[in-house]
Each structure stands twice: as structure tokens, then as C-alpha cells.
């Protein structure tokens, strides 16, 4: 998916890969910092609730990038963080009457289950924000020492005016910056952003030279990038909603601290419904367990990965079912070849498939190659040309493997992936219902109703029976607790 005429020329990078860099606004040759090695940092989840399909799109999109780089023989270090301390986590845990750390750990497991259900490879490391407080404090101290940060009323702020080129990633003019943090009495300038929040009653806090408190959102990723990938690395990735303020503020801190930081910035588009970003606040989310009641995990993965990663993916039931049919066509062909010809081992992808992925991960074009091979293979199989059919089947396995949804891969064939995902969700629902039962026992009806309503938003219906609560996915299977 090229954006400029010169992007159509053959790749000249040693990897053969060209990627769209948000910083430059162009498709550029990807040349790793270290020959044969690629370092990637993906902004992961803020673990405040059950994951919906909008949350996991970045995981699927950049899993394809990782698989393609690995297939090219590169050693990939892939880091995906977990934000386990945040205002929303603290507020939701308090509303439910649960410890904040337990709340975060529970939904971290929910995200892990969702990624696993969709065949996303586990990261090389998955650091939690709370495990890197020391590194954050050290980073903030460096920023204060260099004159880029200051303390105020127990908080610590980054002084945006000290960086003349602030806003270069997002295109924001420094005079027009609005951080969306609200009014803070300790700020010298409302354009500044928070690095550290002073301690508040009832909230977790850690000791620092400027008093107890907890980290701001933008600091954790810079500290963890440094800890796992060094002062300079190849690719920083995330959803396009993170360009500003999160990634802009990461760049500000890293450069102010003297780091080279990321050499490429990659951002995936949203999953939308009715033209709006999928968001709990808008009430237009589709939880992973709810969708997996209607389609298999491999089919959902195919659907989420079928659009170009930078494009918006407008969800519709028709589009989802079209993806199911397309995936079934590939699956049926491979099964036919295996039944009539023999074992199908992955072969070689086609040159057009490779060219598509080398052109900024143009998955729609790559999938067109898959279906072209399927059409050739089906005709060959029907005419008795088993050799051609097998060649096409082996090529399809190679291509679908890069896309993470090879129908003959053992992860899809050796288990009922939907049942596995539902089993993971069952653990989480039981935890929520235990919290609801505790609230009911202390006659806290508002909290009990809130937990039930949140489950319903995630596509989970709770029914109170004489034998205890029973939960079910809306229009799906039910389970006793």
C-alpha cells in the first residue's frame, strides 16, 4: 500500500522490505540497526477490562510483520508491554471493591487468552509497567537534571517548551498542543504533560526523590524500550490513536534524555462500527468471546488481518461472513488435496506474495495470491493433475503460515480453538461473579448491578437461578457457576 510514486520502485534495502514511517510520512527502505537483527516495541494493552476486537487488531497486524521478518531469516526481538497501573484500572477496581493489582492481573490474563486464541505469537518479553518503576524514576531524574522536567505540587511534568520540534510525529504545532489531562495546579504551562503523579489517599504509590506517587502513562514505554531494546531500536508500533499524545510524548522524553529511540514508527488503523472507532465509551464494542461464538478463532484472525494494516476496518456481519467463506475455501482445498493426494507440507510462497508483503505489508494483495493459487489448484485437482494441485497447496500453506492462519497448522487442527478461548473466558467470568456475590452479600446492590451490566456489555448474560448464577454468551452456550 504505497503512498508516493517513488515507493513503486524495487526495494533496495537488504531486507527487501519497505515500510510506511509515520514520522516521515513516506514508505521507506527498512534497514535494521544491526545486520540480521530487528528490534520491535509494540504498545500493548491497558488491562482494565475484557478485550474487544479493536484491541487485538494491532496484535494481529504486527504479528504478520514479525512472521515475515523471521521468514526472511532475521532474528526478531519483539517486546509488547502491559500497562497495569492507570487511572481507569484504579477506578474500575475501586468500583468493584477489588484490589487494583488483582483487577489488572485478571484482565492481563484475558488479553493473553485473546492473543493466544487468535494465534498471535508470544512476545520475546512482555514487561509490566509496575515492574519497571526504578527505570522510570531514573529516566525522570535524567529529564529533571537536563532541564526538561520540573516538580509541582507533588507531581512531575515535562516542559514541552524545551523541545522546539515537539509535535513532529503528529504534526501538531507546539502552540496548539492540548494534552487532555485537565487543569493541574502544579503545571507551569498547560501544554506540559505528566511524568509522575503525586500520591493520593487509597492509591498505590512508590518512593521517589520528589515524594511518593505513581507513574504517568507516557513514561513507562520509554523506560521499558530502553530496558529491553536499548537507547535506539528499529520499530515502534501501535494503534493510530496513540500518535498523539502518547507516542509524541514518548519521543519528547527519549530525545530529551539523549536517546536515538525508534527509527521507524508504524501505526495500524482502527476497527470501526458505523464509521466510529470501536470504543466502550461509545457502546459499539464487540468482545472477543462474543465474536468467537459466531466464528472460529482462525476465521476471526483472517478477517482482522484481511485489510491493510493502516486502513480502517469497518466491521459488519456481512464482511465477517465473507471472510469466513473465503477462509473456508482455502481450508476446503487443502483438505481435498490432503485426502486425495497426500500430506501437504509447506512449500514456497509466490514472488507476487513476497512483493506484496515487502510493499508495506500489503496483505490484501498477498491474499489475492493465496486465492489465485487456490483457483489453480482446484482446477488441477478436478482434472486429475495431482502434481500441480500439491504444488499450489504447499505454496498456500507457506503463504497462510506467514499470515498466521494456515488451516493445516497444528494449532488450528489439534484443538477446538473456540472452546479453548471460552474456557479462558470462563475463568474470568467466575472471578467477576465472585465479586458480584461478595457485593450482594454486603447488600451493595449498585456494585452488583454494575458488574452484571459490564459483563452484559462484553456479550455475557448473567441469570440468577435457585442453583446460583448462570452465565451465557448472548445467543450462545451457557455455563453454571
From Swiss-Prot:
<dbReference type="GO" id="GO:0005829">
    <property type="term" value="C:cytosol"/>
</dbReference>
<keyword id="KW-0862">Zinc</keyword>
<dbReference type="InterPro" id="IPR015803">
    <property type="entry name" value="Cys-tRNA-ligase"/>
</dbReference>
<keyword id="KW-0963">Cytoplasm</keyword>
<dbReference type="InterPro" id="IPR056411">
    <property type="entry name" value="CysS_C"/>
</dbReference>
<dbReference type="Pfam" id="PF23493">
    <property type="entry name" value="CysS_C"/>
</dbReference>
<keyword id="KW-0436">Ligase</keyword>
<keyword id="KW-0479">Metal-binding</keyword>
<dbReference type="GO" id="GO:0006423">
    <property type="term" value="P:cysteinyl-tRNA aminoacylation"/>
</dbReference>
<feature type="binding site">
    <location>
        <position position="221"/>
    </location>
    <ligand>
        <name>Zn(2+)</name>
    </ligand>
</feature>
<dbReference type="InterPro" id="IPR014729">
    <property type="entry name" value="Rossmann-like_a/b/a_fold"/>
</dbReference>
<feature type="short sequence motif" description="'KMSKS' region">
    <location>
        <begin position="277"/>
        <end position="281"/>
    </location>
</feature>
<feature type="short sequence motif" description="'HIGH' region">
    <location>
        <begin position="45"/>
        <end position="55"/>
    </location>
</feature>
<dbReference type="InterPro" id="IPR024909">
    <property type="entry name" value="Cys-tRNA/MSH_ligase"/>
</dbReference>
<dbReference type="Pfam" id="PF01406">
    <property type="entry name" value="tRNA-synt_1e"/>
</dbReference>
<dbReference type="InterPro" id="IPR032678">
    <property type="entry name" value="tRNA-synt_1_cat_dom"/>
</dbReference>
<dbReference type="GO" id="GO:0005524">
    <property type="term" value="F:ATP binding"/>
</dbReference>
<feature type="binding site">
    <location>
        <position position="246"/>
    </location>
    <ligand>
        <name>Zn(2+)</name>
    </ligand>
</feature>
<comment type="subunit">
    <text>Monomer.</text>
</comment>
<dbReference type="GO" id="GO:0004817">
    <property type="term" value="F:cysteine-tRNA ligase activity"/>
</dbReference>
<dbReference type="InterPro" id="IPR009080">
    <property type="entry name" value="tRNAsynth_Ia_anticodon-bd"/>
</dbReference>
<comment type="similarity">
    <text>Belongs to the class-I aminoacyl-tRNA synthetase family.</text>
</comment>
<feature type="binding site">
    <location>
        <position position="43"/>
    </location>
    <ligand>
        <name>Zn(2+)</name>
    </ligand>
</feature>
<keyword id="KW-0648">Protein biosynthesis</keyword>
<dbReference type="InterPro" id="IPR015273">
    <property type="entry name" value="Cys-tRNA-synt_Ia_DALR"/>
</dbReference>
<keyword id="KW-0547">Nucleotide-binding</keyword>
<dbReference type="GO" id="GO:0008270">
    <property type="term" value="F:zinc ion binding"/>
</dbReference>
<feature type="binding site">
    <location>
        <position position="280"/>
    </location>
    <ligand>
        <name>ATP</name>
    </ligand>
</feature>
<feature type="binding site">
    <location>
        <position position="250"/>
    </location>
    <ligand>
        <name>Zn(2+)</name>
    </ligand>
</feature>
<protein>
    <recommendedName>
        <fullName>Cysteine--tRNA ligase</fullName>
        <ecNumber>6.1.1.16</ecNumber>
    </recommendedName>
</protein>
<keyword id="KW-0067">ATP-binding</keyword>
<keyword id="KW-0030">Aminoacyl-tRNA synthetase</keyword>
Amino acid at each position: 500500500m504505497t503512498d508516493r510514486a517513488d515507493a513503486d520502485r524495487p526495494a533496495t534495502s537488504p531486507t527487501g522490505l519497505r515500510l510506511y514511517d509515520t514520522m516521515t510520512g513516506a514508505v521507506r527502505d527498512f534497514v535494521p540497526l544491526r545486520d540480521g537483527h530487528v528490534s520491535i516495541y509494540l504498545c500493548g494493552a491497558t488491562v482494565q477490562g475484557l478485550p474487544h476486537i479493536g484491541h487485538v487488531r494491532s496484535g494481529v497486524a504486527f504479528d504478520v510483520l514479525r512472521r515475515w521478518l523471521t521468514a526472511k531469516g532475521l532474528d526478531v526481538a519483539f517486546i509488547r508491554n502491559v500497562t497495569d497501573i492507570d487511572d481507569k484500572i484504579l477506578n474500575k477496581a475501586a468500583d468493584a471493591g477489588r484490589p487494583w493489582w488483582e483487577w489488572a492481573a485478571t484482565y492481563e490474563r484475558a488479553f493473553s487468552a485473546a492473543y493466544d486464541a487468535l494465534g498471535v505469537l508470544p512476545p520475546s518479553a512482555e514487561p509490566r509497567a509496575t515492574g519497571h518503576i526504578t527505570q522510570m524514576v531514573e529516566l525522570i531524574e535524567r529529564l529533571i537534571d537536563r532541564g526538561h522536567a520540573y516538580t509541582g505540587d507533588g507531581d512531575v511534568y515535562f516542559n514541552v517548551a524545551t523541545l522546539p520540534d515537539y509535535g513532529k510525529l503528529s504534526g501538531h504545532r507546539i502552540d496548539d498542543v492540548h494534552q487532555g489531562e485537565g487543569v493541574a495546579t502544579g503545571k507551569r504551562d498547560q501544554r506540559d504533560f505528566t511524568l509522575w503523579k503525586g500520591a493520593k489517599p487509597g492509591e498505590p504509590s512508590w518512593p521517589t526523590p520528589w515524594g511518593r506517587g505513581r507513574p504517568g502513562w507516557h513514561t513507562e514505554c520509554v523506560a521499558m524500550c530502553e530496558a529491553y531494546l536499548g537507547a535506539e531500536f528499529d520499530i515502534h508500533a501501535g494503534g493510530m490513536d496513540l500518535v498523539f499524545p502518547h507516542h509524541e510524548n514518548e519521543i519528547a522524553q527519549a530525545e530529551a534524555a539523549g536517546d536515538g529511540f525508534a527509527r521507524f514508527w508504524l501505526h495500524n488503523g482502527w476497527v470501526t462500527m458505523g464509521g466510529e472507532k470501536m470504543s466502550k465509551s461509545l457502546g459499539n464494542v464487540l468482545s472477543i468471546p462474543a465474536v468467537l461464538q459466531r466464528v472460529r478463532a482462525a476465521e476471526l484472525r483472517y478477517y482482522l488481518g484481511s485489510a491493510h494494516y493502516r486502513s480502517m476496518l469497518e466491521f459488519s456481519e456481512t464482511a465477517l461472513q465473507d471472510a469466513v467463506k473465503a477462509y473456508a475455501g482455502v481450508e476446503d482445498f487443502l483438505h481435498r488435496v490432503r485426502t486425495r493426494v497426500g500430506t501437504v507440507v509447506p512449500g514456497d510462497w509466490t514472488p507476487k506474495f513476497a512483493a506484496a508483503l515487502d510493499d508495506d505489508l500489503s496483505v490484501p494483495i498477498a491474499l489475492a495470491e493465496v486465492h489465485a493459487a487456490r483457483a489453480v489448484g482446484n482446477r488441477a485437482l478436478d482434472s486429475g493433475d495431482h502434481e500441480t494441485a500439491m504444488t499450489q497447496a504447499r505454496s498456500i500453506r507457506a503463504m497462510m503460515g506467514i499470515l498466521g492462519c494456515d488451516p493445516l497448522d497444528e494449532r488450528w487442527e489439534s484443538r477446538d480453538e473456540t472452546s479453548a478461548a471460552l474456557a479462558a473466558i470462563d475463568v474470568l467470568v467466575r472471578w467477576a461473579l465472585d465479586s458480584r456475590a461478595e457485593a450482594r452479600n454486603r447488600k451493595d446492590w449498585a456494585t452488583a448491578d454494575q458488574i452484571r451490566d459490564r459483563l452484559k456489555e462484553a456479550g455475557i448474560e448473567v441469570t440468577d437461578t435457585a442453583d446460583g448464577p448462570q452465565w451465557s454468551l448472548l445467543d450462545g452456550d451457557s455455563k453454571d457457576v
